[in-house]
């Protein structure tokens, strides 16, 4: 189930991923890996403000932010050469949990959801939806990669088209939504790893408008009260 090393390295480096997507004609946000590259693209009218910056190899959206002026962008990129610059995507922020079968090497499950709210880089409120165009876009994009098992894909929907942002070759932090909607990756893993059999196609086999809400809370009670409630449950 572990990703191929070359694929894992590609997914970890967001700028290399961008170059790979462009090379393979997969729609993605315009990205620049340095201030000189951005300056050339900006002067050529290929990218405009506001823009979005984030670490080239970061995770959890640490350091990611919007920037509105060339002066501020130059300043932050001079301070941190590990940043990349992307065009600001203003469309819908989406996520897809994907399972690539380890026997057939084909995607057998795609669970798509809209992000309603995010925290520390991950979605904590999402709602499921289906779109055959999204399923087709994901399947076509995956032809360029070598994956095994669970994936987490970040996408945008803007101006009537889907764009691929990032791929994490692992379970996504919000995979619980897919599982709760009946998209059972552990069962797929069991079939592949234990039974050595390929999974059948489950793409789109879930209900729309299933909502997941994750939240933190604080409970302050006496120990005997908690124990009593647990016994009741």
Model features per residue range: what roles?
Residues 65-146, 156-157, 161-163:
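Phosphate-binding site of ATP-dependent enzymes
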Residues 130-233:
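ATP-dependent carboxylate activation and anion-phosphoryl transfer catalytic cores
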């Amino acid at each position: 189930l572990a990703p191929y090393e070359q694929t894992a390295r590609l997914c970890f480096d967001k700028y290399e991923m961008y170059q790979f997507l462009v090379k393979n004609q997969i729609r993605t946000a315009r990205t620049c890996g340095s201030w000189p590259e951005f300056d050339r693209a900006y002067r050529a009218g290929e990218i405009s403000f506001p823009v979005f910056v984030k670490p080239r190899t970061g995770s959890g959206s640490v350091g990611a932010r919007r920037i509105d002026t060339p002066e501020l962008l130059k300043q932050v990129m001079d301070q941190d050469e590990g940043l990349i610059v992307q065009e600001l995507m203003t469309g819908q922020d989406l996520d897809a949990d994907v399972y690539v079968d380890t026997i057939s090497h084909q995607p057998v499950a795609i669970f798509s959801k809209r992000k309603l709210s995010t925290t520390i880089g991950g979605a904590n409120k999402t709602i499921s939806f289906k779109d055959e165009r999204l399923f087709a876009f994901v399947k076509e994009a995956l032809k360029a990669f070598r994956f095994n098992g669970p994936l987490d894909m970040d996408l945008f929907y803007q101006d009537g088209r889907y764009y691929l942002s990032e791929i994490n070759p692992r379970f996504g932090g919000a995979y619980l939504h897919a599982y709760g909607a009946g998209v059972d990756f552990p069962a797929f893993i069991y079939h592949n790893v234990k039974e050595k059999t390929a999974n059948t196609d489950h793409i789109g086999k879930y209900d729309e408008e299933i909502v997941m809400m994750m939240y933190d809370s604080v409970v302050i009670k006496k120990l005997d009260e908690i124990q009593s409630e647990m016994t009741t449950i």
